């Protein structure tokens, strides 16, 4: 009897073989759910929430976040896979598949009496060797636009259908190249993702400027200005209550009038400063002048600005203030005391677009924008969500490629190369740990197998063809998902991120090892002691 049972008769315990069986079945259950998602030919999953909201997705990360997983081991694997996505932006589904397969292969040997500890030693040796192989086969190359487009396309085609992926690829790569600075880390927050429920998903485009999700608040303001100066400020142009809730006392109506006038004058002086600056820089020319303010602008101030032909937007989001100055230039101001023409940015075109109840302000034709907007369009909400998730992963894939300075061939080529190298390496490992290396090599082959299976080909036949081709030609051969035949991934331009594969090897081995070494599962929390 388990020791914990003596202390707490209500505790649930699974021991040795039973504990392992519970864990392996959890990993395989999760693997079966995500198996059909892998690769560009993977299928969709429809998630229906308790409130009846529908989400259509192929992205493993979204699935694992949205699914309610009860089983503790499955939940642990899901957390590891989503952490993989947080770190590298890709490889979630592969992570779950490889962990499930490592446990499945290990189970074959354990059922024949091999101790889990010996298998885990083999796993560790195999991981070290696999990382060496990865170092050898990575391709260091100049990250030009062509290469980045191949990397982004490989990532995006696994998330959305091919036609849309090709549209998004160009937009994603161009947005990264626009915000990239020499020898500085890439800040993906400088790419704003704005959604419009409008037209079809292939109308998604890159705006070399900014799109704000609100418009001017005065009917007389121009809807379109060209060659515009942009003033970004965080100054209140409305009367605000004091922060400490203090009040004023006045003896008579005259005093109250004076007080109101003083308040009004205080705001009007600020508006006058803006108007004077506009007259100074625009003169009699028909150049536009746009004020974008993070705080409020009251109706009187809006009226005064509209009379002067100034377009004013109030309550802009804080994240957009930083992007604005990067896109248009200029300096954001917290006070109007040191207002001068050097503080102004410039945009070639500013216009307002109305879509149903919503208004959007486009700031375009900026001279060298360091911040851009990806305008996502789609007919309904779940299409927009799906595209946004895909774009996020696409942006990360391009960023990783630039940061790594190298890429690895995709289409299962890396996994086949590692598996073949491990089988040769096996004979140099001492003792029974060889079996762990063999299990690791077999587990890696799940990726090309599932890619072939999801494309409708016989998985064993395809795998045999690829392995034969690999050993004969010595090239990095992957699966051609259109024909089921072997192909050289590098020639076709199918590239994966190096850091994704590296992270994959580390996290899968650690989690599979930990799960194999569990020989007792106890559910003996405080709740079990009640009653």
From Swiss-Prot:
N6-acetyllysine sites (modified residues): 5, 199, 287, 365, 377, 388
Sequence positions that bind ADP: 39, 91-94, 158-159, 411, 496
Protein's organism: Oryctolagus cuniculus (Rabbit)
Stated name of the protein: T-complex protein 1 subunit zeta
GO molecular-function term, one example from the UniProt record: WD40-repeat domain binding
Placement of covalent cross-link Glycyl lysine isopeptide (Lys-Gly) (interchain with G-Cter in SUMO2): 251
Taxonomic path: Eukaryota, Metazoa, Chordata, Craniata, Vertebrata
Keyword Ubl conjugation recorded: yes
Catalytic activity: ATP + H2O = ADP + phosphate + H(+)
């Amino acid at each position: 009897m388990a020791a914990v049972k003596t202390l707490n008769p209500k505790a649930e315990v699974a021991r040795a073989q039973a504990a392992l069986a519970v864990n392996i079945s959890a990993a395989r259950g999760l693997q079966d759910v995500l198996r059909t998602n892998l690769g560009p030919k993977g299928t969709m999953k429809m998630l229906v929430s308790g409130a009846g909201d529908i989400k259509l997705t192929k992205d493993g990360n979204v699935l694992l976040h949205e699914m309610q997983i009860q089983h503790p081991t499955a939940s642990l694997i899901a957390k590891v896979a989503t952490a993989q996505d947080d770190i590298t932006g890709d490889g979630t589904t592969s992570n779950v598949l490889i962990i499930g397969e490592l446990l499945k292969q290990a189970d074959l040997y354990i059922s024949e009496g091999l101790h889990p500890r010996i298998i885990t030693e083999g796993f560790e040796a195999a991981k070290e060797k696999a990382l060496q192989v990865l170092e050898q086969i990575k391709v260091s190359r100049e990250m030009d636009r062509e290469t980045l487009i191949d990397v982004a396309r490989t990532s995006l085609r696994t998330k959305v259908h091919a036609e849309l992926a090709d549209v998004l690829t160009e937009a994603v790569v161009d947005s990264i190249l626009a915000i990239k600075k020499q020898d500085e880390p890439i800040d993906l927050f400088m790419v704003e993702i704005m959604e419009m429920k409008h037209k079809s998903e292939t109308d998604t485009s890159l705006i070399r400027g900014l799109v704000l999700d609100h418009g001017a608040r005065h009917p007389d303001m121009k809807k379109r200005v060209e060659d515009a100066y942009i003033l970004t400020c965080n100054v209140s142009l409305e009367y605000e209550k004091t922060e400490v809730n203090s009040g004023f006392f006045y003896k008579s109506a005259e005093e109250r009038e004076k007080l109101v006038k003083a308040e009004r004058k205080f705001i009007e002086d600020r508006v006058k400063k803006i108007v004077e600056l506009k007259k100074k820089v625009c003169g009699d020319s028909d150049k536009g002048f746009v004020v974008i303010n993070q705080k409020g602008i009251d109706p009187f101030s809006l009226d005064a600005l509209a009379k002067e032909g100034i377009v004013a937007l109030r309550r802009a989001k804080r994240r957009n203030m930083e992007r604005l100055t990067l896109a248009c230039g200029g300096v954001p101001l917290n006070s109007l005391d040191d207002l001068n023409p050097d503080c102004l940015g410039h945009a070639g075109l500013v216009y307002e677009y109305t879509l149903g109840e919503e208004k959007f302000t486009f700031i375009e034709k900026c001279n060298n924008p360091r911040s851009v907007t990806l305008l996502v369009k789609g007919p309904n909400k779940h299409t927009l969500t799906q595209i946004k998730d895909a774009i996020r992963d696409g942006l990360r894939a391009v960023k990783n490629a630039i940061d790594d300075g190298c890429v690895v061939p995709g289409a299962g080529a890396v996994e086949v190369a590692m598996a073949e190298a491990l089988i040769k390496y096996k004979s140099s490992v001492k003792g029974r740990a060889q079996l762990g290396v063999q299990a690791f090599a077999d587990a890696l082959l799940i990726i090309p197998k599932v890619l072939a299976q999801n494309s409708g080909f016989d998985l064993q036949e395809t795998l045999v063809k690829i392995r034969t081709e690999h050993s004969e030609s010595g090239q990095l051969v992957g699966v051609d998902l259109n024909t089921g035949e072997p192909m050289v991934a590098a020639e076709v331009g199918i590239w994966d991120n190096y850091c994704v594969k590296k992270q994959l090897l580390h996290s899968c081995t650690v989690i599979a090892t930990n799960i194999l070494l569990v020989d007792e599962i106890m559910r003996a929390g405080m709740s079990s002691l009640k009653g």
